[in-house]
C-alpha cells in the first residue's frame, strides 16, 4: 500500500509492483482525504493492523480514517482540536504488536497520541522533548520517533507507560551518525533502526541503542531523490519512496551491515 498524497489516494500494488487498486479521493467525506499540511506540502501516514484493516493519517482533515482490508470505509478516529486525544495535523501512524494505534500530531506542540484500533482514546500522550514528530515505529517495548526539526531520533519505553525519552541520537550534520531532515523510521526484527534523511539523500542504520552501523548513500545501491518513506518487508528487502521523481527503490537490507 502506498499513500499517494498529491492525488488523495491509497494505492495498492502487488509484490512485483503491478497496480491493483486505489482507494479515496480529495475532500472531507468518509472516503475522502486531504494530505496537505499547513505549509502546503503533502503529508500523511498509513499502517495496517493484524486483521488487515487500513489506517490513514488524514492530515488536512485532522483525523484518522479506518478502512477495511478491501478499502471500504469503516470509521473516523479523533477530532480536530487541542484537547487531549484531539488532532491538529496528524502525520504518521504506527500499529504496534498489541494493535495499539499511535499517531504523531505535529501542530499540537508536537505529541504522540495513543488509541485502540476501535478508536478508543488510550489516555497516554507523549509530549516530552518533541518538536516536530514526523514518523514513528515500534516493537514490543519501545516507540522510536523521528523528530525532524531537531534532526534527532528519540526512543520511548512504552512497556512501562513512561512518556520520557530513553535515548536520543543524531543531531544536525552530514557525517555518519548525524542527521539532516530525517523524515521516516523503521525497525527490523533485531531492533535495528533505519532512518530516512531527505536532507542528505540517504538511509542510515543504527542499533537499538542508537549507535551508528551503516548507510546507503545516493548513487551507491539505489538512486534517491528526496526519499520520504521506508518499509522493510518479511523477505529482508527495503522499499524507499522518492518524492521528487515519484519512484520506489528496492534493495536488500543485508547491504546495510
Where are each of the predicted segments found?
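Flexible "stalk/tail and boundary" regions
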Residues: 1-257
Amino acid at each position: 500500500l502506498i499513500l499517494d498524497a498529491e492525488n488523495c489516494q491509497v494505492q495498492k500494488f502487488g509484490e512485483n509492483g503491478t497496480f491493483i487498486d486505489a482507494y479515496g479521493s480529495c475532500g472531507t467525506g468518509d472516503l475522502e482525504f486531504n494530505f496537505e499540511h499547513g505549509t502546503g506540502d503533502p503529508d500523511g501516514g498509513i499502517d495496517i493492523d493484524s486483521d488487515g484493516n487500513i489506517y490513514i493519517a488524514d492530515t488536512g482533515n485532522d483525523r484518522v480514517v479506518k478502512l477495511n482490508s478491501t478499502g471500504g470505509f469503516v470509521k473516523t478516529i479523533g477530532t480536530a482540536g487541542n484537547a487531549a486525544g484531539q488532532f491538529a495535523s496528524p502525520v504518521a501512524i504506527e500499529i504496534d504488536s498489541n494493535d495499539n494505534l499511535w499517531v504523531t500530531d505535529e501542530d499540537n506542540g508536537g505529541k504522540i497520541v495513543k488509541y485502540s484500533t476501535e478508536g478508543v482514546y488510550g489516555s497516554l500522550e507523549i509530549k516530552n522533548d518533541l518538536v516536530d514528530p514526523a514518523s514513528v515505529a515500534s516493537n514490543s517495548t519501545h516507540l522510536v520517533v523521528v523528530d525532524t526539526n531537531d534532526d534527532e531520533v528519540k526512543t520511548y519505553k512504552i512497556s512501562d507507560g513512561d512518556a520520557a525519552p530513553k535515548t536520543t541520537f543524531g543531531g544536525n550534520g552530514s557525517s555518519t551518525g548525524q542527521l539532516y531532515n530525517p523524515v521516516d523510521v523503521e525497525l527490523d526484527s533485531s531492533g535495528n533502526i533505519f532512518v530516512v534523511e531527505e536532507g542528505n539523500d540517504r538511509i542510515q542504520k543504527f542499533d537499538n541503542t542508537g549507535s551508528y552501523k551503516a548507510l546507503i548513500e545516493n548513487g551507491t545501491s539505489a538512486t534517491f531523490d528526496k526519499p520520504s518513506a521506508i518499509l522493510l518487508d518479511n523477505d529482508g528487502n527495503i522499499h524507499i519512496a522518492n518524492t521528487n521523481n515519484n519512484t520506489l527503490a528496492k534493495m536488500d537490507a543485508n547491504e546495510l551491515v
